């Protein structure tokens, strides 16, 4: 092979990623095979998990689908898992895939309404601390009845809308015309400082909102997928689930909201940045012009979107169908009654969610490796061998640690299955079984905010269109989530250990 051709292949491999990153991925692929053959599948499995976390941490260097996908293909070739195991994992999580395919697209068609509502909130509330608290509380409240990914998609859609409006105006473009807003080259130097401050402002709101989904999601049967799973195993209905989990979930919710206020007041961990006056003026002018120029057709479209939002909330609250199917219904209703009949306009709605959907398939493949190699089995056995009074607290910690690096639905599935088996074998009372079930539920929900790996909503935020725009990297997410992780983790552990 000629030198120029070799250079071309090297340049094409993972595109514009840094050379050191490309070398790391090639090194991972070689190392995995060596470790598997020399040490064994368990060591190779843990190595794969660490490598996948690395690709997520470097999401701004290269979208994790490509390097993660290469690691997945190698794991399948090395028989660390099988295509059938991956397929079964996807079948088990098909509702999540449906949700990403259709619900996120449905939210896209509601972006005019969302931008209208959030701009009123953003421009109407001057206090940043109060605004952050409202974002966090609303996210928590909505996530208690809706899906955390849906709520996150709403927040992301609003943030992209705000960012695009200011960036286009600052670049001298029409904010109502589609134009590139990810490149700062055409931005006058005068606006760079305001833009950086605006990015920090949006980052803090996005993180408050994302944490809010975890605070609210833990409270109810429909808040998170693993809640439904645990509730089904325990035979708990909506009200019973809420009351059983309340001694842990409600104090943590209050503590989370207090943490939100303190972070904004103290300006720690990257929080507390105010909305620049110039940006506020641009957004206010845009909102005023929008209101003045709104035609009867646009008002009718907003009304349709509002009705669709009510139908969406009712459909999700009463669980009339899988979340993704409700999202498809929203797409049909809004497009039919607002005159969106062009295939290309429909296609735009699916652009943001499909890369993440593909990445989630790779994520489930890593989960399949964890399951096939029984990487968590020793930890589960150790916890269940402890004295009964220590089990809830240790189960909470074990769940939290594993949920921070793996899928919390998977972790909850493994633990509740093992604990139920122990209960059916007569090793514990029904009361103790219920206590352990609450520990599993809260342990998989609360400490998992530590990294984007644990919460699907966090992973969605990290790999969404808004993350590179506001410079929200993996490391920055972990740093900004740290105070919440400490407060929610410690109080959750204390409540599980002493208040149940």
Curated annotation (Swiss-Prot):
One of its GO terms (molecular function) is sodium:proton antiporter activity. Its main location: membrane. The chain crosses the membrane at residues 28-50, 58-78, 96-116, 129-149, 150-170, 205-225, 241-261, 311-331, 350-370, 394-414, 449-469, 477-497. It is found in: Cell inner membrane. It catalyses: 2 Na(+)(in) + 3 H(+)(out) = 2 Na(+)(out) + 3 H(+)(in). GO terms for cellular component: plasma membrane. It is a multi-pass membrane protein. Keywords: Antiport, Cell inner membrane, Cell membrane, Ion transport, Membrane, Sodium, Sodium transport, Transmembrane, Transmembrane helix, Transport. Na(+)/H(+) antiporter that extrudes sodium in exchange for external protons. Belongs to the NhaB Na(+)/H(+) (TC 2.A.34) antiporter family. HAMAP family: NhaB. This is Na(+)/H(+) antiporter NhaB. It comes from Pseudomonas fluorescens (strain Pf0-1). The gene is nhaB.
């Amino acid at each position: 092979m000629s030198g120029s051709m070799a250079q071309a292949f090297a340049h094409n491999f993972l595109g514009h990623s840094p050379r050191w990153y490309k070398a790391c991925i090639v090194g991972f692929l070689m190392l995995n095979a060596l470790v598997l053959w020399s040490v064994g599948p368990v060591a190779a499995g843990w190595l794969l998990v660490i490598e996948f976390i690395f690709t997520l941490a470097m999401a701004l260097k290269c979208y994790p689908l490509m390097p993660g996908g290469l690691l997945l293909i190698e794991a399948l070739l090395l028989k660390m898992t099988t295509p059938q195991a991956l397929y079964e994992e996807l079948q088990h999580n098909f509702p999540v895939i449906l949700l990403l395919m259709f619900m996120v697209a449905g939210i896209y068609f509601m972006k005019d309404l969302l931008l209208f509502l959030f701009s009123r909130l953003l421009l109407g509330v001057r206090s940043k601390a109060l605004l952050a608290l409202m974002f966090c509380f609303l996210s928590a409240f909505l996530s208690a009845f809706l899906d955390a990914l849906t709520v996150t998609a709403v927040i992301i859609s609003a943030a992209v809308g705000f960012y695009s409006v200011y960036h286009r105006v600052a670049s001298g473009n029409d904010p109502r015309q589609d134009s590139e807003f990810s490149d700062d080259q055409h931005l006058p130097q005068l606006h760079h400082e305001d833009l950086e401050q605006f990015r920090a402002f949006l980052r803090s709101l996005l993180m408050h909102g994302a944490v809010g989904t975890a605070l609210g999601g833990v409270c109810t049967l429909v808040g998170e997928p693993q809640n439904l799973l645990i509730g089904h195993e325990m035979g708990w209905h909506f009200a019973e689930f809420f009351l059983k989990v309340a001694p842990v979930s409600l104090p943590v919710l209050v503590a989370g909201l207090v943490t939100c206020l303190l972070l904004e007041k103290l300006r720690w961990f990257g929080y507390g940045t105010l909305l620049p006056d110039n940006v506020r003026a641009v957004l206010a002018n845009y909102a005023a012009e929008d209101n003045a120029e709104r035609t009867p057709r646009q008002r009718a479209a907003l009304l349709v979107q509002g009705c669709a939002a009510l139908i969406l909330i009712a459909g999700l609250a009463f669980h009339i169908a899988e979340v993704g199917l409700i999202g498809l219904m929203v797409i049909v209703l809004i497009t039919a009654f607002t005159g969106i009949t062009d295939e290309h306009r429909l296609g735009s709605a699916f652009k943001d969610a499909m890369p993440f959907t593909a990445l989630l398939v790779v994520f489930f493949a890593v989960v399949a490796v964890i399951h096939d190699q029984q990487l968590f089995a020793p930890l589960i056995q150790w916890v269940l061998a402890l004295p009964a009074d220590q089990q809830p607290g240790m189960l909470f910690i074990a769940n939290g640690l594993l949920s921070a690096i793996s899928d919390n639905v998977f972790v909850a599935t493994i633990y509740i299955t093992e604990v139920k088996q122990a209960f059916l074998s007569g090793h514990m009372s029904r009361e103790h079984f219920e206590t352990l079930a609450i520990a599993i539920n809260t342990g998989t929900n609360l400490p998992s905010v530590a990294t984007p790996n644990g919460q699907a909503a966090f992973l969605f935020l990290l790999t969404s269109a808004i993350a590179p725009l506001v410079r929200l990297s993996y490391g920055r997410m972990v740093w900004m989530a740290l105070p919440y992780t400490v407060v929610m983790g410690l109080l959750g552990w204390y409540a599980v250990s002493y208040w149940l």
